[in-house]
Curated annotation (Swiss-Prot):
Binds 1 zinc ion per subunit. Catalyzes the attachment of alanine to tRNA(Ala) in a two-step reaction: alanine is first activated by ATP to form Ala-AMP and then transferred to the acceptor end of tRNA(Ala). Also edits incorrectly charged Ser-tRNA(Ala) and Gly-tRNA(Ala) via its editing domain. SUPFAM superfamilies: Class II aaRS and biotin synthetases (SSF55681), Putative anticodon-binding domain of alanyl-tRNA synthetase (AlaRS) (SSF101353), ThrRS/AlaRS common domain (SSF55186), Translation proteins (SSF50447). It comes from Lactobacillus delbrueckii subsp. bulgaricus (strain ATCC 11842 / DSM 20081 / BCRC 10696 / JCM 1002 / NBRC 13953 / NCIMB 11778 / NCTC 12712 / WDCM 00102 / Lb 14). Coiled coil: none annotated. This is Alanine--tRNA ligase. The keyword Protein biosynthesis applies. NCBIfam families: alaS (TIGR00344). Zn(2+) binds at residues 567, 571, 669, 673.
Amino acid sequence: MKKLNSSEFRQMFLDFFAEHGHMVMQSASLIPKDDPTLLWINSGVATMKKYFDGSVVPKNRRITSSQKSIRTNDIENVGKTARHQTLFEMLGNFSVGDYFKEEAIPWAWEFLTSPDWLDLDKDKLYVTVYPKDTEAHRIWHEVVGLPESHIVQLEDNFWDIGEGPCGPDSEIFYDRGQENNDVPEDDPENYPGGENARYLEIWNIVFSEFNHLPDGSYVEQPHKNIDTGMGLERVLSILQDAPTNFETDLFLPIIHATEEMSAGKKYGANKADDISFKIIADHIRAISFAIGDGALPGNTGRGYVLRRLLRRAALNGRKLGIDGAFLYKLVPVVGDIMKSHYPEVSDQAEFISKVVKNEEDRFGATLEAGLTLLDDLIDKAENSEDKTISGKDAFKMFDTYGFPYELTVEAAEDKGLKVDKDGFDAEMEAQKERARKARGNLQSMGSQDETLMKIKDKSVFEYGVYEEESQLVDIIVDDKLVDKADGEKATLIFDKTPFYAERGGQVADHGDIYDQEGNLVARVVDVQHAPNDQNLHFVDVVLPLVKGQTYKLKIDRARREGLRHSHSATHLLHAALRQVLGEHTHQAGSVVEPDYLRFDFTSLDPITPRELKNVEKIVNEKIWEAIQVKTTETDPETGKKMGALALFDGKYTDKVRVVQMDDFSIEFCGGTHCDNTSQIGVFKIISEQAIGAGVRRIEAVTSKLAYEYLAGRSDILDQIQAQVKATKVDGIQSKIASLQEELRSAEKQNAAYEAQINASKAGKIFDQVKTVGDLTVIATIADVKGMNDLREIADQWKSEGKSDVLILGAKSEDKANMLISLGQKALDKGLKAGDLIKSVAAIFGGGGGGRPNMAQAGGKNPEGLQDAIDAAVSQLD
């Protein structure tokens, strides 16, 4: 068996399949691109959906990758088991309609057992197969030579997630020996594929050969695929003879760095401490990679997952005696471990550390608030009949303040109290259900479109061309290939086209199609990419079109010009944001429409008005500098050396286009652009807002739309000038300031009048003193506007000491307010204003509360206000 470090093992896997004709694909971002069904990329195959469902045909149908992935469905098990992790790497080889079982199985065996590769002991390898998959069984036994005693048939070996591609699979297990088991040798689960620690699953090969239809039936797919997944960390634990994944070179440096910050704690000395070390090591890996790919802590979605991981790790740091923020110090350690294959963490270590430190500091304040709440919950439980902290309260401690359930239980037991575990579990399950619904179907896979996949005809988009003659090579009507289109709708493919197909945020060109006589035959309303990268023209048919004939394609020139303006302006905006806010700012999405753009980007903090103006100024300065826009076609590596900015979720083919505007902006981009920045004319930001945790959005207009926007604002300014009667535009501000001062003076005078009126009304109210028991009481509905007036009367009542109790109401058409104020005599009798008002507020459709000496409530049923006052008075005796 080879002794390899993590970098050597990862590279060996990729090299093996590269030698077998596979294209090595770089790991995709953890943040899914164009896939709303996924919260995170959670497997290697998650990045292959577009190939397996046929929406895109890869340049090479053989692909291999090492894909970083995140799964958080079993977060509570991380640290407690040998294998659970949130971040992991999935090694995989994939065939998109190329090879199948006859190649996939022997290759897996060769990589695992050949002396040239991993050289694992063949006697320690077992496989499981689906009972009906006799072909896989035969290959394992007859071709590979695996004895029958090492082949286990399991009904579970069928990969099926509902509608879409599915098929049998074969799992490979490594026997770690009974000495590493967690069940007795005679346990019924002690077999490959059972619940035990002896047989470690290291590789799964899925033979995707069927399509699961909506009616529950299965049909063979037109193209059979191979999808495999090997857990890098699991196999590494074998190669490094590590008891668990956490003793490999991927985790130990993080654990050792944590030891140095702890209060003398050592990994391996104490089981409880070991759990904390493992949780910290695992979580900081996931946190670092996720932030590096553009995610930021927040209250929803990915942001919530990050926040939860960070808090769990921080709490475990406290268990190890680490005070204050410390996780941010581990980010460079993670970067050093992974930089050979994933340089993004090391390259962004400063920014990632800053984000983590900020979040740790925030949690420090939250933690203290949580401890205060825990004390309140204990007091509440001590005064309850069942001496129990409710499950809902315990879950709030967990969910809002990051307190593990066990910590709440421990604190309760110290006081002789219990915690409602059933209630807690119910709240937890409800949250998981909400999360499941939010995630959607994490493994959803579309069905293959056989019609589009069969089309092999070339279809070339030609940059810089506005009209040209082209041959119609394919016609699709109602998902079928036909020779003639004479209905209302059709999809057309031409051998070459001036129409840009929607991609990279830029919407498609529109335009017209003419026959050789100059007759309009179709209007192009959309253009999209087919699986084999042809351009699909979606058209409204005007006159019949015939396959094989030549037509003139003519795009809407004005629309294209507007798109060029917006797309080039988007690049300038991206560069300006990075210049003003910092190079950690990443694009998080964009929409490019004619003379309008929407740009989403990552930012920890809100943008100040000054920063936003600076960004806008920089973009316009670059427009006025009349910079030549240079486009170069090259390979990705050369493009990167040129300084081209690669999007964190970008996947690039062998040939890429680099769009350059001097040294200010250099990006990979396949869109259409101006020849010179001066063609943009003018750039105007019309809105900026937060759209999610750490993600903000700018909307802007260019050229004609920018002029129209500014002209509209100028018209509004002229109207305001007329309304405030300013002699010129420059005088509007001073005129408004003068009007505001007049308004403040009038409001002040009005308030004085109202105070006099209320004082007069208060005098009449104070004359209505009556006795209830041994208390003097004023209880009435006052003829005032609302709560502010009631509070003024209460202040006057308090200063004059008119009675022991004041109960006032005020009502309007659809609202009611109530105020109760108690003097010292009433308080000495044990009365509490807050309790009184809570007991009667529902009578007038409201709710409220307050202090023992004063409370207030609001409601929506004014008709019930007098009854509520009477009910409050009745409780005084």
